[in-house]
Amino acid sequence: MASYYSNDFRPGLKIMFEGEPYAVESSEFVKPGKGQAFARVKMRRLLTGGRVEKTFKSTDSLEGADVNDLNLTYLYNDGEFWHFMNNETYEQLQADAKAIGDNAKWLIDQAECIVTLWNGQPISVTPPNFIELEIVDTDPGLKGDTAGTGGKPATLSTGAVVKVPLFVQVGEVIKVDTRSGEYVSRVK
């Protein structure tokens, strides 16, 4: 695998740090008037999702991580594993609850997901940015009830709870941003 100096760090680069894969989120190269240049780097730990800030000298180098992102289709959950399929090879892959994390509530059948593999094992699953889900439970919106923030909680078909406008009713299909967990619009 390639080796990268700290001044080569760019957002999206995947590197090995302390024996684990990390993704660089931001990197600022600083060249002070006196002293050695350094890079201030914000990284996300791919195994747990935790964020780390670290300062590297300009002479420091790290190995690139052997991490692959695959576009796979979500098939089903058997209670223990979530199953995905590669649409080109029809090869199936299973991910455990640790790899899925909080994204389980955004997985719907036939959704195109990005599965990140490290050493051939799934370490994270990213659902599509926007999905359409049906509302299965919410309070009725009363006419003229606009006091407060103008939102109410709604339970979706996957079990996720999002805040929706007062006019949205049970049985309607809405579009949700999976990155923030927020209501986007009604689907016609």
Curated annotation (Swiss-Prot):
GO cellular component: cytoplasm
GO biological process: peptide biosynthetic process
This protein's record includes keyword Protein biosynthesis: yes
N6-(3,6-diaminohexanoyl)-5-hydroxylysine sites (modified residues): K34
Gene3D superfamilies to which the protein is assigned, alphabetical: 2.30.30.30, Nucleic acid-binding proteins
Subcellular location: Cytoplasm
Keyword terms: Cytoplasm, Elongation factor, Hydroxylation, Protein biosynthesis
GO molecular function: translation elongation factor activity
PROSITE patterns listed in its UniProt record: EFP (PS01275)
Pfam families, sorted: EFP, EFP_N, Elong-fact-P_C
Keyword Protein biosynthesis belongs to the record: yes
Family: Belongs to the elongation factor P family.
UniProt name for this protein: Elongation factor P
Organism of provenance: Yersinia enterocolitica serotype O:8 / biotype 1B (strain NCTC 13174 / 8081)
Gene encoding the protein: efp
